[in-house]
């Protein structure tokens, strides 16, 4: 699971799903299913009405589910032959759904209307590109940045992060900002909140910045045990196990899933999906680029997207809906939610994205990160691979085994998954 999509299951009380349709009588009825929360429901109610106004004769039913319920229900619907006409997709899951024949090939539509993809960030399309064309298109994209608590930095007399920071600078600051504030012998303020299991948010960026790679899908190799990668892992292990400046998930459990949002870490690495969650914070905060490593600066890029069911009875109408969903009007509306970067380059340079209510930060920073972004690996069996690697990493962060042993275990387990999915 990509971390930014975890937002739809954190603190969101959706009773299974929310379903509505915008009009009554129509010649064609389309169904669309999405993952999301209350704000997504509100914006898609408006967009549904807008779509029907510009597409007379089509009635649109949209259903929004929380993250876990969405995938559970989608599996049942697809297996039962009652899949929605259009449904949301996470790039990491895309190859598995395409391999099972659940997705309609979009290339014929794109070939007939090539201008539809003009102005879309090319890198946002990469995850959905297959040897025989597209079976899905991106809705939005995510890059990773460094968030920091200005109040904690001020209290400790530590200078704010800058775009010249290296990982060594971050580590030094994190050590100074890790404190036992009440003197009871237990750390209650950490330097950095970082997701230590899933690759998207933190450790992939560190590995890439050390010159390492993650996976070679073509040859079925997990590459996180290379010499360059081990230097990165030793750096991370130093912060977690030696400095104790990055809390483990067990240490954070009492504070919730996000230590930065909870106000117990001075810094946090996350994507734009966290901005709306941080807006109500009682502390002052800012954002900076990811620090540089020996091989430069790096961030992952991932996306959510849209697909059309291979069993739809209305492929042309479904394509019209997909075009609408990735078009300028919908992209402007979705940009104002503040959860992601729009795929339309022009929108990212407009007030619709750059000026977001209650979030006066440098939103352009997330777009600028595309210049040094690495595509999060997308391949069949990704979720199984990530789980296998994550299990091994958990053993390291809990102190059960040394990091070198955990990575050796992760590589072997990852390679087995890759072999089983070739």
Give the ranges of each region predicted by the language model.
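Short, well-ordered beta-strand elements
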Residues: 27-37, 58-63, 85-86, 135, ...
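Extracytoplasmic "Venus flytrap"/periplasmic binding protein-like
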Residues: 46-120, 154-157, 257-259, 263-267, ...
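Conserved C-terminal helix/tail region of periplasmic/extracytoplasmic solute-binding proteins
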Residues: 59, 154, 160, 238-244, ...
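Hinge/lid segment of periplasmic solute-binding proteins
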Residues: 91-145, 284-288, 352-368
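Short, solvent-exposed loop/beta-turn-alpha elements that line the ligand-binding surface or hinge
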Residues: 107-120, 163, 182-192, 212-231, ...
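Long, aromatic- and glycine/proline-rich binding clefts that accommodate carbohydrate-like moieties
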Residues: 123, 127, 285, 337-391, ...
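Extracytoplasmic/periplasmic solute-binding protein
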Residues: 131-139, 144, 169-221, 265
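Glycine-centered hinge/linker elements that transmit conformational signals in sensory
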Residues: 173-175, 218-249, 279-281
């Amino acid at each position: 699971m990509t971390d930014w999509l975890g937002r739809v299951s954190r603190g969101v009380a959706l009773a299974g799903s929310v379903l509505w349709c915008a009009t009554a009588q129509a010649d064609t009825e389309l169904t669309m299913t999405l993952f999301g929360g209350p704000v997504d429901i509100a914006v898609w109610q408006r967009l549904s009405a807008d779509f029907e106004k510009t597409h007379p004769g089509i009635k649109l039913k949209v259903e929004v589910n929380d993250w876990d319920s969405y995938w559970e229900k989608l599996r049942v619907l697809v297996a039962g032959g009652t899949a929605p006409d259009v449904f949301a997709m996470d790039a990491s899951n895309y190859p598995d759904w395409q391999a099972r024949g659940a997705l309609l090939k979009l290339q014929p539509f794109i070939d007939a209307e090539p201008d539809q993809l003009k102005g879309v960030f090319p890198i946002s399309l990469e995850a959905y590109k297959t040897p025989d064309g597209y079976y899905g298109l991106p809705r939005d994209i995510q890059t990773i940045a460094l968030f920091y608590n200005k109040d904690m930095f001020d209290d400790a007399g530590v200078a704010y992060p800058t775009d010249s920071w290296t990982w060594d600078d971050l580590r030094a600051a994190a050590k100074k900002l890790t404190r036992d504030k009440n003197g009871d012998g237990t750390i209650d303020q950490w330097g950095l909140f970082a997701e230590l299991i899933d690759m998207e948010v933190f450790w992939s960026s560190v590995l890439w910045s050390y010159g390492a790679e993650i996976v070679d899908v073509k040859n079925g190799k997990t590459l996180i045990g290379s010499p360059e990668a081990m230097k990165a892992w030793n750096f991370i292990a130093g912060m977690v196990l030696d400095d104790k400046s990055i809390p483990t998930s067990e240490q954070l459990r009492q504070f919730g899933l996000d230590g930065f949002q909870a106000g117990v870490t001075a810094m946090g690495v996350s994507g734009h999906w966290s901005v709306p969650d941080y807006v109500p914070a009682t502390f002052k905060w800012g954002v900076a680029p990811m620090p540089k490593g020996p091989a430069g600066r790096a961030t992952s890029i991932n996306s959510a997207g849209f697909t059309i069911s291979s069993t739809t009875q209305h492929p042309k109408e479904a394509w019209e809906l997909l075009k609408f969903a990735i078009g300028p009007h919908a992209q402007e509306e979705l940009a104002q939610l503040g959860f992601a970067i729009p795929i339309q380059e022009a929108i990212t340079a407009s007030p619709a994205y750059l000026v977001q209510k209650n979030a006066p930060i440098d939103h352009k920073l997330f777009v600028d990160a595309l210049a040094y972004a690495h595509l999060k690996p997308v391949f069949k069996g990704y979720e199984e691979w990530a789980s296998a690697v994550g299990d091994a990493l958990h053993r390291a962060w809990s102190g059960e085994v040394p990091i070198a042993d955990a990575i050796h275990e992760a590589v072997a387990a990852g390679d087995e998954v890759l072999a089983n999915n070739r």
